[in-house]
């Protein structure tokens, strides 16, 4: 009994899908316009999400973590400087550090600055010893980093502590802004998709009014009557999602050359990322849900309105 019921449901579903597809193909121009409107509506939040995704990837790739640069007093002897370094190492929130002595700082400066001969004229080394500190993950948030910076400044022998996170904070703020823009676009375009599907289903319901009346006279259930409209809404949304993914891919490809030009200037390696497989599947699932819900709301409402008028 169960197998025959399953087969009956499968046959009914296949028959309804064929009928819906034949109807959509018969009025293919209107179907194409509806799908394109849905696709454009979905492309906007998809591209906004991809902008946020790529900026977030760039932020984590080029600025994976912030560092604190500590400048020691120049009048410290090498022995006292080592004692200060040990105090810094024992400070809570310090994961690792790299100590560069005054002599090493001068040697590095000579090697890349090209002022080696000029620096030989000076009687005293003008560069301080430097300690580069990597904070622990707990202290890698803004408030904790500031707290660590304050504590390091209190250590005797420390002249200045600089927090190298200006670009990180700017990129994080920009990423936050784009994320909110993406959310706003998603909400607006989701409403637009519901309206487009609802309007299309409304037209289908009123054009099939006589068929609906006949089915009701024959004792058809509401679910049976609604099924073609639900499938129509899901097909609209699914095809719109597929076209939106294609549009998004074209847009990412278009901007890839521009991004490569910029990254070549800055001598870094970065390429734009499109939708992953999981993200693509998630987009299609969301489209199916939107199509189903939008079609159900529109069809139920307008069929009920027709019944009240009768």
Swiss-Prot record:
Pfam families: FtsX, FtsX_ECD. It comes from the Bacteria. One of its GO terms (biological process) is cell division. It is found in: Cell inner membrane. InterPro entries: ABC3_permease_C, FtsX, FtsX_ECD, FtsX_proteobact. Residues 1-31, 198-234, 301-310 are cytoplasmic. It is a multi-pass membrane protein. Part of the ABC transporter FtsEX involved in cellular division. This is Cell division protein FtsX. The lineage of its organism: Bacteria, Pseudomonadati, Pseudomonadota, Gammaproteobacteria, Pasteurellales.
């Amino acid at each position: 009994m169960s197998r025959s019921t399953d087969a009956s449901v499968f046959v009914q579903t296949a028959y309804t899908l064929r009928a819906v597809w034949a109807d959509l193909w018969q009025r293919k121009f209107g179907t194409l316009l509806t799908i394109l409107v849905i696709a454009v509506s979905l492309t906007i939040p998809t591209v906004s999400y991809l902008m946020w995704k790529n900026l977030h990837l760039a932020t984590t790739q080029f600025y994976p973590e912030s560092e604190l640069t500590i400048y020691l007093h120049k009048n410290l002897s090498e022995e006292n400087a080592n004692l200060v370094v040990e105090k810094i190492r024992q400070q809570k929130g310090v994961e690792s550090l790299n100590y560069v002595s005054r002599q090493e700082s001068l040697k590095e400066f000579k090697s890349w600055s090209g002022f080696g001969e000029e620096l030989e004229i000076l009687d005293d080394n003008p560069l301080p010893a430097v300690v580069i500190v990597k904070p622990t993950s707990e202290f890698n948030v803004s408030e904790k980093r500031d707290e660590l910076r304050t504590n390091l400044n209190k250590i005797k022998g420390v002249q200045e502590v600089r927090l190298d996170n200006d670009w990180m904070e700017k990129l994080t703020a920009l990423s936050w802004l784009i994320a909110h823009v993406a959310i706003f676009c998603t909400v607006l375009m989701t409403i637009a998709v519901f309206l487009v599907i609802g309007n299309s289903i409304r037209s289908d319901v009123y054009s099939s009014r006589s068929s609906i009346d006949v089915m009701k006279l024959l004792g058809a259930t509401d679910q049976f009557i609604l099924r073609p409209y639900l499938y129509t809404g899901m097909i609209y949304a699914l095809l719109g999602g597929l076209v939106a993914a294609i549009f998004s891919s074209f847009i990412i490809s278009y901007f890839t050359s521009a991004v490569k030009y910029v990254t070549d200037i800055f001598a870094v390696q970065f390429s734009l990322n499109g939708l992953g497989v999981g993200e693509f599947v998630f987009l299609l699932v969301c489209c199916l849900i939107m199509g189903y819900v939008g079609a159900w709301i529109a069809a139920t409402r307008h069929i009920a309105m027709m019944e009240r008028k009768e």
